[in-house]
Each structure stands twice: as structure tokens, then as C-alpha cells.
């Protein structure tokens, strides 16, 4: 899908409002389950079969409590915008119809609504969540602060989630499969890329806790630093952590004799670089 033209920096409320055809309004009705097709704009890729069956059992007992959201797609056909789990569970439960809100909205608004609806839920895996957040940032030019407000998370949580996409692909796959947790990933991000993969593989093999991976990450970093004074080295390590948290990218303070030095900031995508400039208060458009 093409990126949104001329939408950089606009608020999410404006995006959603401008994408709707308010002349027709929303319609609450029932729609044949077979007439709905999966949406193109879903953050969710992986759906747990056991959880889906539990939802289907609930629907058999109580019906579909919350309508799905769709838009018209051809004659008597609908495209799903939000509510894929409910729609799939309704099929398992044997329902032929499902309550639905029919909206008349643009592609970009359908994308935003579908992503936000899924991101507000708790059961996305960390990589699905990061990929959904990245689409909101890339395709709509939304700031981390705006995204944070939309999905009900802190700005630092958004930045930390997006940083997961800088991990090596095999490590991302471990997160996708939930063999590693978000806490493991945060600890791994402090290390060079080659060491991230090595430690991740050991963590999965040995079933290490988040605390254990944090301890080993810190030990690996300390082994690389010259320590003329232990207190000074600890201070620099703490400063690295503070800069990384504040700027949303890996940061490293390097000193010579503790009198002069340099600060190195690492980024691996244009989007990460753009966010860094934003955090530094630099308004730059290439």
C-alpha cells in the first residue's frame, strides 16, 4: 500500500475524522458470516487456537457481545476492519450471522482503526505489536507520542517496542514464538548484534529468566570496558542506560582518562534516525 501523502505529523483524531464519509453515518446491523472477508490491515498474524476455541464456546453460550467493524466491499460483501477473533470464533461456533457496525471509510482510516483495535489488546506477541506500531509511524508519519496516546501506552514503551525490530531476525522469531519475553529483549538490546543472537540462543536453551539475561548482558558489557575506577565505570554504564532510555536508541559514552570523550548513538533504519532527530529537537526533512 502506498504511503499517505501530505499526512506527516497530523494528529490521529484528524486522520480518523478525515477518512470517514460522515454523510452516511455508521450502521449497526447483522451480516452473514460468509459475506465477510479478512481485512488487509490487521496487526495480528498469529491467533492461538486454544484461545479461539474458548471464545467460540463463550459465543455459543452468550452470543457475540461486541459487534465487529466492517466496510462494504462490492455487492453484499464486507471487509473486516476490527474483530477478526470474534469473526473466526463465530464461524467455529456455527453462527451464520454476526452483529456488525458498517463504516464508510478510506483505506488509510481502515488501516489505522484495524491496527489500533488490535494494539489495544494484550495478547499480541511482541513482534506483532512492534510491526503494527511501525506501520502507524511509517505510513501515517505519526510521532511516538501520538501513537502512545492512541493505544494507551507510554511514549517510552512505544520506543522500546519499535527497537525490537533492530534485533537479528532469529531473535525476533524467538519473540514471535514467545520463547523470549519483552524483558529478555530489552536486556539483549544493550549488546552488540553478534552477542545478542548468542545470548538469546543460550537463554532459550537453558530457560533463563529475564533477570538472568540482564545479569549476563551487564557482565558482558563490563568485561569490554576498561575500569581504571570501578565507580567511574559504573557511572558511565548508568549514563549509557539513561541516554538509551531517553533517546530510544542504543547510546555509548566513551572517555579517555575521564577528561574528554565522545557519545556514540546507534541507529539502523531511517525511521530510527528520524526519531532520534526528533528527540534531539532537530527539525530535518531530507
From Swiss-Prot:
Q: Which GO terms describe its molecular function?
A: DNA binding
SUPFAM superfamilies xref list: KorB DNA-binding domain-like, ParB/Sulfiredoxin
GO CC terms on record?
A: chromosome
Keyword terms = Chromosome partition, DNA-binding
- A single Pfam family it belongs to is HTH_ParB
User: Any idea what job this protein has?
Assistant: Involved in chromosome partition. Localize to both poles of the predivisional cell following completion of DNA replication. Binds to the DNA origin of replication.
Name the UniProt record assigns to this protein: Probable chromosome-partitioning protein ParB
Amino acid at each position: 500500500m502506498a504511503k499517505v501523502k501530505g499526512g506527516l505529523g497530523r494528529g490521529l483524531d484528524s486522520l480518523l475524522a478525515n477518512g470517514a464519509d460522515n454523510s452516511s453515518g455508521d450502521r449497526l446491523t447483522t451480516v452473514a458470516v460468509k459475506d465477510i472477508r479478512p481485512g488487509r490491515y490487521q496487526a495480528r498474524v498469529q491467533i492461538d487456537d486454544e484461545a479461539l476455541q474458548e471464545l467460540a464456546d463463550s459465543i455459543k453460550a452468550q452470543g457475540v457481545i461486541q459487534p465487529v467493524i466492517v466496510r462494504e466491499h462490492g455487492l453484499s460483501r464486507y471487509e473486516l476492519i476490527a474483530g477478526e477473533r470474534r469473526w473466526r470464533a463465530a464461524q467455529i461456533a456455527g453462527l451464520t450471522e454476526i452483529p456488525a457496525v458498517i463504516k464508510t471509510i478510506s483505506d488509510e482510516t481502515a488501516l489505522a482503526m484495524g491496527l489500533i483495535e488490535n494494539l489495544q489488546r494484550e495478547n499480541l506477541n511482541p513482534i506483532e505489536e512492534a510491526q503494527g506500531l511501525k506501520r502507524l509511524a511509517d505510513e501515517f508519519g505519526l510521532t511516538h507520542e501520538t501513537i502512545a496516546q492512541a493505544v494507551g501506552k507510554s511514549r517510552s514503551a512505544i520506543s522500546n517496542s519499535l527497537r525490537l525490530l533492530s534485533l537479528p531476525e532469529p531473535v525476533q522469531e524467538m519473540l514471535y514464538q514467545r520463547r523470549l519475553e519483552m524483558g529478555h529483549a530489552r536486556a539483549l538490546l544493550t549488546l552488540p548484534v553478534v552477542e545478542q543472537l548468542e545470548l538469546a540462543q543460550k537463554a532459550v536453551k537453558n530457560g533463563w529468566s529475564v533477570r538472568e539475561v540482564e545479569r549476563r548482558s551487564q557482565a558482558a558489557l563490563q568485561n569490554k570496558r576498561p575500569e581504571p575506577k570501578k565507580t567511574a565505570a559504573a557511572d558511565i554504564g548508568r549514563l549509557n542506560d539513561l541516554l538509551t532510555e531517553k533517546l530510544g536508541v542504543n547510546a555509548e559514552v566513551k572517555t579517555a582518562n575521564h577528561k574528554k570523550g565522545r557519545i556514540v548513538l546507534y541507529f539502523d533504519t531511517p525511521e530510527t534516525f528520524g526519531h532520534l532527530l526528533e528527540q534531539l529537537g532537530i527539525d530535518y526533512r531530507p
